[in-house]
Amino acid sequence: MQERQYVGRFAPSPSGSLHFGSLIAALGSYLQARAQRGQWLVRIEDIDPPREVAGAADRILSALEHYGLLWDGQVIYQSQRHEAYRATLDLLHQQGLSYCCNCTRSRIQQLGGLYDGHCRHLNLGPQGAAIRLRQSTPVYAFHDRLQGELQADPALAREDFIIRRRDGLFAYNLAVVVDDHFQGVTEIVRGADLIEPTVRQIALYHQLQAPVPTYVHLPLALGANGSKLSKQNHAPALPDGDPRPTLVAALKFLRQPLPESWQDLDLSLLLSWAVAHWKLEDVPRREAISLDENTSAFSKEPW
C-alpha cells in the first residue's frame, strides 16, 4: 500500500500576535514537514470570538511570511467551517455517540472539575444545553514521536467531554479533529501545552472511524518567571526587523545545528539549511525549557 504524503500544519488562534513561543511551534512543524518533502498548511482557529483580537489573524499570517515560513494551499479559517462541525455533530448524534447536558460549570467545579456523566441517560433536548461525546472506548495513553509514551489521567481520559458548548460555540476538540481529518494532516507538531487534550482527540478520531495522525509535542519556552510564553501572559510580539537572529534563537532552542556563518546567508538560504539539517531526535525530550537555563543558547533580543 502506498504511503500517504506527509501533511503537517500550524494552527494558531487569533487571540494576539505571534511571539517567540509561537515561532518555536511554527518553525518545528515547518521543518518537520519540509524535511520530509511534505506539505505544510496553516489554519486560523477562530472559533471562539470572545477571545479573538481584531486584526490578529492578518498579523499572524504577515509574521509567518516575514519569517519565511511560507505555507501550501489556501489558509483555512474555522469560522468558515461551521457546516462541517454541525454535520459531524449530527453524525455522532445519529450513532448514539453524543448527548445533551445542562450541568452548570459550578456543579462540575463542586465535583472537583471532572464531569460525572449525570446527563448521560436523561435524553435531554439541545435547547440551552452543551453536547458531550459519549466515551465508549477511552484512550489512556499515546505515543509521542518526541516525548515517548505518554499516560493520561484516567479520570480525564474517561470523561464525556464537551464537543459543543452551551452558548452554541463549537468546542476546540471537535473542530481540530474535524479540520485535521478534512485537510489530510498526517502528523501534528505542536507545543507540549496540548499534550493533555490529545487522548480526547484520539478518542474522537476513533468514534469517527478516521485515521489518527502521529503526534510530536515540542518543549514550551518559559519566561524568566517560569510561566509559559503566551498571549495570555502578554508575551511580546515577534520583532519585525531582520528575522534571522530570532530564527537562529528558535533553532538553538530546538537544539538544531547552525551554519558557521549564518549572518552571511539570506533568509531563504538559512531556512533551506535548517531543513536539510533538521533532526527531530535532537530536540530536547522535555515539556518545557526556561529561556534563561542556558543564556548563551539564546539571542539577547527581549521576547
Swiss-Prot record:
GO terms for cellular component: cytosol. Pfam families: tRNA-synt_1c. Zn(2+) binds at residues 101, 103, 115, 119. It is an enzyme of class 6 (ligase). The gene is gluQ. Its cofactor is Zn(2+). This is Glutamyl-Q tRNA(Asp) synthetase. Keywords: Aminoacyl-tRNA synthetase, ATP-binding, Ligase, Metal-binding, Nucleotide-binding, Zinc.
